[in-house]
Amino acid sequence: MWESHSQHRDYFTYGRGYWDAVAAAQQAKGVGQPAGSAIYFAVDFDARGADLVPVDQYFRGITAGLAAASGGKADYKVGVYGSGAVCDTLKRSRLAEYTWLSNSTAWAGSSSFADWNIRQGRPFASLGFINHDSNEARDDYGGFRLAGL
């Protein structure tokens, strides 16, 4: 998942989406992430109504940035992490192929959105000091395994 300053509406512009996608693609290639797998981009706030306009522009920038990073055709598929409203809007507009539904059930559309590929569960602690979230994935979520691991 690519997450920068995705907790604020003002972060989401076409230009930031473009450059985040270029950086994410470079990082993915650097670690050996195979073409055809997904990079998820986070929208980590309760975006609703007018908030979805800059989010849309950000994901249009992502589409262009991933294509540019690969010489014209994107090597990676686009996923989104966010509320049900964000996931639904971006999937319907075909700006995201995969959705990772946030566990923030009070966020817009989250309790009713059913077309998720990954659904975040409740956070819990492991070893008493490392906090992490559980996640449930459906068949195809754009994942991959690195060769030899």
Language model: regions and residue ranges:
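Active-site-proximal loop/turn and secondary-structure-junction residues that shape catalytic pockets
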Residues: 5-6, 45-47, 82-86, 124
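Structural recognition of the beta-strand scaffold that forms the well-ordered cores
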Residues: 1-2, 37-42, 77-80, 99-101, ...
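Functionally critical loop-and-helix segments that line ligand-binding/catalytic clefts
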Residues: 87-149
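Active-site cleft segment of glycoside hydrolase catalytic domains centered on the general acid/base Glu
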Residues: 45-70
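Sec-exported extracytoplasmic/periplasmic mature domains
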Residues: 26-33, 63-71
